[in-house]
Amino acid sequence: AEVCDESRFEKTTKGALDVLRDLGGDGLFTARNDEPNWGKAHRLLMPAFSPSAMRDYFDDMVDIADQMLTKWERLGPEVSLDVSDNMTRLTLDTIALCGFGYRFNSYYQNEMHPFVDSMVRALREAGRRSRRLPIQNRLMLSTTRQYESDIEYLHSVTAELIKKRRKLAKEETPTDLLSRMLNARDPLTGETLDDDNIRNQLVTFLIAGHETTSGLLSFATYLLLQNPDVMARAQAEVDRVLGDGPARYEHIAQLVFIDQILRETLRLYPTAPAFTVTPKVDTLLHGRYPLRKGDICIVLLPSLHRDPEVWKQPERFDPDRFAPDAIDKIPAKAWMPFGNGQRSCIGRAFSLQESTLVLASVLQRFEIWQPSSYQLKIKESLTLKPEGLTIRARVRKHVARPLASRPVSRPVQTSSSPEPASAHGVPLLLLYGSNSGASEAFARRIASDGNARGYTTKVAPLDDYAGKLPKEGVVLIVTSSYNGQPPDNARKFCLWLQAVPAASLLGVRYAVFG
């Protein structure tokens, strides 16, 4: 936990990540902390991973998942299915469609899209280059030519995506990740992203957005096959929540045991298995071990996640470690598959939603089994995946959804707005702290209801009212936190609140939603 203290340590891109900059440049994953484009892109892209954005992505996720499941159904139970191959196709197609409106159509061709081939070769070579002496890399002319050719192809594909999107008329432009990168302005600086950085972000999202999630789904499949009792519980939950109908966005939050399975899978097999940090100044680790500024510390997640002082029987697959009544007992920094602090994975919600949908959909439609015995072999590049894992899948014969789980018919509402009330004019100030936009949207929704009930409402960021909270009327604060830190538009407010004498706030009527 000590090296995860962001007041003392920060992410470093020295070593392997420095070589990965050949592919991703100053994209979110490989950007250095002092590069302006990191903060700008992070602030600008946070709303693209908000709860409202996740709802918008859901139908496209279903589209791609259905392509995979339809192919399995048509191939039939006599055909062995390569799990990692199928999940790689699925996650690549999903991030491309949800994020950029592009279809790789991986399930309509036998070979992987050339983008995947180039990406895999480039990632493999980047890892090797980080372990070689510089002179070795310079002497390997043929290997270097292939490496540079693969990177050029990755960049050309993403540059073409940008070019095509810029040609679309405004009414034809989808609301997705790419459109946000092209059009949105950084709320702090007012600047937009340049095309080179957008290209780097596209490469980053296409690589990181599908590699890690495909590994998660592949390992989860393996662990379910090894633990049939867990698979039976998961299938029972899916039958109760989904029945034999199509998955809906609202189902995701109800698939609690599926979520536990995914989190326990990430404990045992974190698909991004390490991250590196460096001390900001010379320091002592654990009060004993001297570290100099610039030294590299590697946090190995498979070891961290198997600490016997935290996890009983750490090698055992037990999703109940993450049950609702147990998850709060897990010590901070004991489970970190998405990294640490402000440099943690921005796409965490996207990955978990996609994985929950896909795993539930597989269990809803199929009985799966292994055609032969399998000894786990892990393939490592930038991420971890099980190598050579195959399954067979037979369409299930469904039973009707239990009566208690059937949706209850409700009267049709002609309007979602409250009944108008006479205007009494009491001031209602809605203050929000929000990077992703979710808290701001909730504040504006409350304001709309307040107007209908006769209040005089105003909505503003928390920072606008640092030092001047009104004592007239009511103040409602709607805010989130990010890795223990205030949102960008609430920093000044938090600093003021920590220093202000308590007596000066007497008379302020307030409530906090957080």
For the regions a language model picked out, list residue spans one by one.
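Conserved cytochrome P450 K-helix/beta-meander segment immediately N-terminal to the heme-binding cysteine loop
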Residues: 6-8, 299-327
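Cytochrome P450 catalytic-core helices
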Residues: 212-230, 235-237, 348-364
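Cytochrome P450
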Residues: 52-63, 73-97, 105-114, 136-157, ...
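Conserved cytochrome P450 K-helix E-x-x-R motif and the immediately C-terminal K′/meander segment
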Residues: 156, 160, 245-286, 308
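Cytochrome P450 proximal C-terminal region
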Residues: 65, 69, 117-121, 239-247, ...
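Conserved cytochrome P450 catalytic core segment spanning the I/J/K helices
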Residues: 50-52, 146-216, 250, 255, ...
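Cytochrome P450 substrate-recognition site 1
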Residues: 1-57, 64, 82-83, 87-94, ...
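Cytochrome P450 heme-thiolate "Cys pocket" and heme-binding signature region
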Residues: 24-30, 203, 208, 246-250, ...
